[in-house]
Amino acid sequence: MKAILALEDGTYFEGTSFTGPGESGGEAIFNTGMTGYQEVLTDPSYTGQMVCMTYPLIGNYGITKEDIESAKVHVAAFIVKECCKHPSNWRSVMSLPEYLKEAGVMGIEGIDTRALTRHLRINGAMRGIISTEELDPEKLVAKAKQLPTMEGQNLADTVTSETCYAWQDGKPVPVDVSSGYKWSDKGPRLVLVDYGVKWNILRLLDEQGFEVLSVPSHYSEEQVRALEPDAIFLSNGPGDPAVLDQAVKNAKSYCEDLPVAGICLGHQILGQALGGKAFKLKFGHHGCNHPVMDMESKKIEISSQNHGFCVDISDCSDLKITHKNLNDETLEGFAHKTKPIIAIQFHPEAAPGPHDSCYFFARFRNLVKDATGK
């Protein structure tokens, strides 16, 4: 079925829908990972984005139950050079086209993804639309121009959990905290603020011995403190960090007397809470092959990344840079000089990607132990 991808600057590509008829729009970006498409599809941080995979063949190992990062597909649309309809993998339960059809998400193949990637790299991420229903490029370009830009959007509140849940036996278990929460105290009490968390973050925090309770992004500081946590964790998530005023205000309060860590959007929220400024990157960092330097050890780590925004802490005298991106030298991590506060912009939990930076969770565990004795 013929489909057209049209961008707001007038550029368009003709291809074929591998998910049937439909129309979908969002911010067009590219991901440089060769594998890991299932984790990409289910990462809440991709909400509102049409993801172009730079590797030419996607879908050859199908879809597995074990590799999802949230309860549903979050991308606005999926763009590939060629989609494999007949996967080969003993764990696979369905093909990529079947998975996207079931989720109601548009998929397009047969376009020149290399040309699209180069265009986005040169001109920046931009609004776009994919359609099988309207095949007039000019009309689609006009539609793309009407879509909201990523800047100014609070998407975290659209993907956060509706209720609190504990992470138990490798899965989220809803809990009622209206009358308080009974901790088992088998480990430090960790409240994770869910801005669109990936499940592998929860798995690795659990492995470190934390007793993890996740709360929705709209939870107030008073509600969080009523749970009597030993530490706070700010998760990854989608959208513009500069509009999350309440989240930044809450984080600033937590930093006064609690150990705090953040990943991705959580890193940006923490950075702003401590005096930094958020800004949008030209085309973002999306993929599992981004080189990052640990500024203390000078070790180079290959990291999994997914962010379109960054934070500038150059005017924050209380913070030190712990990680730097070697491609564009943007900030990838910081720590407070005197308080148990650390954050990184990339994804140490991988899923997909290398495990070079998994030590982040152990590092936070040690900070919490030193601060609380637990």
Swiss-Prot record:
This is Carbamoyl phosphate synthase small chain. InterPro entries: Anth_synth/Amidotransfase (IPR050472), CarbamoylP_synth_ssu (IPR006274), CarbamoylP_synth_ssu_N (IPR002474), CarbP_synth_ssu_N_sf (IPR036480), Class_I_gatase-like (IPR029062), CPSase_GATase1 (IPR035686), GATASE (IPR017926). Small subunit of the glutamine-dependent carbamoyl phosphate synthetase (CPSase). CPSase catalyzes the formation of carbamoyl phosphate from the ammonia moiety of glutamine, carbonate, and phosphate donated by ATP, constituting the first step of 2 biosynthetic pathways, one leading to arginine and/or urea and the other to pyrimidine nucleotides. The small subunit (glutamine amidotransferase) binds and cleaves glutamine to supply the large subunit with the substrate ammonia. HAMAP family: CPSase_S_chain. Pfam families: CPSase_sm_chain (PF00988), GATase (PF00117). It comes from Maridesulfovibrio salexigens (strain ATCC 14822 / DSM 2638 / NCIMB 8403 / VKM B-1763) (Desulfovibrio salexigens). The gene is carA. Residues 1-185 are annotated as: CPSase. Coiled coil: none annotated. Its EC number is 6.3.5.5. L-glutamine binds at residues 45, 237, 239, 265, 268, 306, 308-309. It comes from the Bacteria. Composed of two chains; the small (or glutamine) chain promotes the hydrolysis of glutamine to ammonia, which is used by the large (or ammonia) chain to synthesize carbamoyl phosphate. Tetramer of heterodimers (alpha,beta)4. Keywords: Amino-acid biosynthesis, Arginine biosynthesis, ATP-binding, Glutamine amidotransferase, Ligase, Nucleotide-binding, Pyrimidine biosynthesis.
